[in-house]
């Protein structure tokens, strides 16, 4: 077994304004709240916010880096709920909990069900997540 029920893993991340803008451009997200500090200052958010594609990538990336250190890993499905913005220059905690591990003979590994979130500097959940990955010896 390469994953364990109740296993937790996390990391802290701070996205700079230039990282927020570059990721949004690369993802094809033209919303100026991710690119233009002057525009963002006039919104309800008052500053640059990371795109949903960027925050979801942080969550998916953490599963990949965590489980790939133990063997082969493939993402099967992910679900996200965006509750509040993640701001540029805000240090956030990206967290996952292994909820269930199911051996899957046909796929040749364990199907791992996860529950995750990104917590803002205030401790509140900014993004909620669920995921399912395959962890195996080989692909």
Where are these regions (language model features)?
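Catalytic strand-loop segment that frames the active site of acyl-thioester-processing enzymes
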Residues: 1-50, 137
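HotDog/MaoC-like acyl-thioester-processing domains
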Residues: 1-8, 85-139
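Short, intrinsically disordered/low-complexity patches at protein termini
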Residues: 33-34, 73-74, 79-81, 111-112, ...
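Sparse recognition of residues in long alpha-helices and their boundaries
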Residues: 39, 75, 105-106
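Hydrophobic beta-strand-centered segment that forms part of the acyl-chain substrate-binding groove
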Residues: 43-50, 56-99
